[in-house]
Amino acid sequence: GRKKGVQFDEGAPDDFDPNNPYKKDVAFL
């Protein structure tokens, strides 16, 4: 939630995939 949002505000995470930005969220689900 909020912490991840702050991460995106500061810059994409190291494992951020521009082709599938929600891959990490889906993995948690």
UniProtKB/Swiss-Prot annotation:
A Gene Ontology cellular-component term: mitochondrial inner membrane
Keywords: Electron transport, Membrane, Mitochondrion, Mitochondrion inner membrane, Respiratory chain, Transport
Organism superkingdom: Eukaryota
Major localisation: mitochondrion
Transmembrane segments: none
Subcellular location: Mitochondrion inner membrane
Protein topology in the membrane: Peripheral membrane protein
Region (Disordered): 1-29
Family in the record: Belongs to the complex I NDUFB10 subunit family.
Protein function: Accessory subunit of the mitochondrial membrane respiratory chain NADH dehydrogenase (Complex I), that is believed not to be involved in catalysis. Complex I functions in the transfer of electrons from NADH to the respiratory chain. The immediate electron acceptor for the enzyme is believed to be ubiquinone.
Quaternary organization: Complex I is composed of about 45 different subunits.
Protein name: NADH dehydrogenase [ubiquinone] 1 beta subcomplex subunit 10
Organism expressing this protein natively: Solanum tuberosum (Potato)
